[in-house]
Amino acid sequence: MHRRQFLSGLAALAFSPRSSAAEVEVDGVRLNRRLSELTSFGRTLEGGISRVAFSEADREARKLAMSWMREAGLAVRIDAAANVIGKREGRDDSLPPLLFGSHLDSVPDGGNYDGQVGSVGAIEVVQCLEERGIATLHPLEVILFTNEENGKTGSRAMAGELVGSELDLPSHTEKSITEGISFLGGDPARIDDARRKPGEVFAFLELHVEQGAVLHRRGIDVGVVEGIVGIERWNVRVDGFANHAGTTPKDERQDALLTASRIVDAVNGIATETEGRQVATVGKIVAHPGAPNVIPGRVELTLEIRDLDMVKIAKLQSAIEIETRRIAAVNGTSVSFEKYYESRGAFADDRLRNVIRESAEALGLSTLFLPSGAGHDAQSLALIAPMGMIFVPSVDGISHSPKEHTLPEDVEAGANVLLRSVLATDALALD
């Protein structure tokens, strides 16, 4: 299904005379073996991975990754946010570093590809350069970010986005974020030291599994990410009147759950009928009092909308709210909205998108421009530097699941695209 013609062809790049950039490829066997080795940390009985941030499994996986980073010639340190950073000097260390990497933590009972492919792939890229004596103009830094799955703690700290009060929040372990950062070797009291300002990072690249089915089902080798969607979430409350389910006549019922069910249908209809790639989801519904013989008097539900354009999200929410108020009034109920979460969308840099596309096509790989429907560390780094993302196919679009899988040849292809993209980006002028 996927073409694997590793063709030569990356022109005008800075490299050591010991090896030509066009000859360079990652060691796919080593790369996939290391991915497999990571499964020993947090493996569940069902075959999944529970390597949640700040767990013992997380810490041990990071230790192994740091040993690989040192083997690749990187100078390794842990910053105040517990991000693992491996640096390779460039020919001009006065220049800002080119960053690339991902994360090692997983969701509870997840898989071994989300974040892992980009992390191990980044290490492999540097090891490949080191073994072939290829120097870059800019310093290179491989970053393994902290706690991506539960708030992007590490990348948001690096982008100066982390709010101090968040450090007291609980994690997926019994530890608070503060305790977890300390557990992994960071220093939460000096969290601001992890911050990089605009201009201090040359660019950021992230290799990642798609976590959707577009590439796999269309037989496309590489996704060139257009941007990472913005996300907004609301708590929606429907108020009716709780009453006896048997003695209250049909025309006197103020059924909050009936209103809520029609709201769910309206959300789907508005999102579907609006042109574009936006999605809207009602993911949680709780009815009160929750008894079989009582008409629900109150229902709480969540609304989430995702799109690259934050203005479009606002317009969609407004249309949904207008329609839900109409539905509520018809049923003798009322509705209220409270926004509780916002993650702003981030567009990939046009120049880096072209670099990724050209790097993939030079390898004989098919490409497709597409948005990321999930959040990533790259979203935070886009606040301080040009950002680009490379997607490789997820089999059947399954992710955050023990059944998550990406084919070894796709992992290798993605790492080769990252390798060429790093070299091509190093030669760019991104001022």
Annotate each language-model stretch with its function.
Residues 79, 135-136, 191-195, 247, ...:
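Flexible, glycine/charged-enriched surface loops at secondary-structure junctions
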Residues 28-36, 41, 48-111:
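Acidic/His- and Gly-rich active-site-bordering loop/insert found
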Residues 5-21:
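N-terminal export signals
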Residues 150-151, 156-311:
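Midchain, well-structured core segments that form catalytic/ion-binding scaffolds
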Residues 100, 109-148, 234-238, 250-270, ...:
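Alpha-helical metal-binding/catalytic segments enriched in His/Glu/Asp
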Residues 53, 281-290, 302-308, 334-353, ...:
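A short beta-alpha structural unit
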Residues 31, 39-44, 101-102, 367-417, ...:
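Zn-dependent metallopeptidase/amidohydrolase metal-coordination segment
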Residues 25, 40-44, 174-226, 264-269, ...:
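Active-site-adjacent substrate-binding region
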